[in-house]
Swiss-Prot record:
Taxonomy, superkingdom: Bacteria
Organism whose genome encodes this protein: Psychrobacter sp. (strain PRwf-1)
Family: Belongs to the UPF0301 (AlgH) family.
PANTHER family reported in the protein's UniProt record: UNCHARACTERIZED PROTEIN YQGE, UPF0301 PROTEIN YQGE
Name assigned to this protein: UPF0301 protein PsycPRwf_0144
GO cellular component: cytosol
SUPFAM superfamilies per the UniProt record, alphabetical: VC0467-like
Stored Pfam families: DUF179 (PF02622)
InterPro entries from the UniProt entry: AlgH-like
Amino acid sequence: MTLDNLTHHFLIAAPSMPDERFAQSLVYICRHDRHGVLGLVVNRPIFDTQVGHLLDNLDIEVTDTSVMYDTPLDGGPVYPEVGFVLHTGQPTWASSFPISENVCITTSKDILQNIAAGSAGIGHYHLCLGHASWHEGQLEKEISQGDWLVSPGDLSLLFEIPFEERWRHAAEKIGVHLDFLSDEVGRA
């Protein structure tokens, strides 16, 4: 696998991850280009609030009651006050761009209004507060040091597997049993 473009891939934190902010995290890479990497942690629910409460704070009326109790995610340590909507569907919103054929990231209020109303066109979604980012070459270095494992993107893992199972499930999907992973990284 080449590390040139990890867009629509997962980063699986190694058990020996030195940065506690990412311990046992699963990060979905939304953008990887010559400027760096932007990703969203997709297995850290924020249980002390609900999407409905956050939308209410933005003066967005929630008419779809199922949205009221959806759980937002801690998307990462950078700009935790900024919301990112990771969703299936097409990039038809004011500030939206595609990640893969059927996954987009959107930061505009119009998608939040549609989520609140239960409108069609969104499918699965996660409201992530904050994001993770790496400057040019930083992530590649962390991968070579053994801090991260890499796995191809998978809609089921992204939207259907329970949050608490995602980290292990992602590793097992690439044949890695995290309990047996060595803390040492070497080269032959």
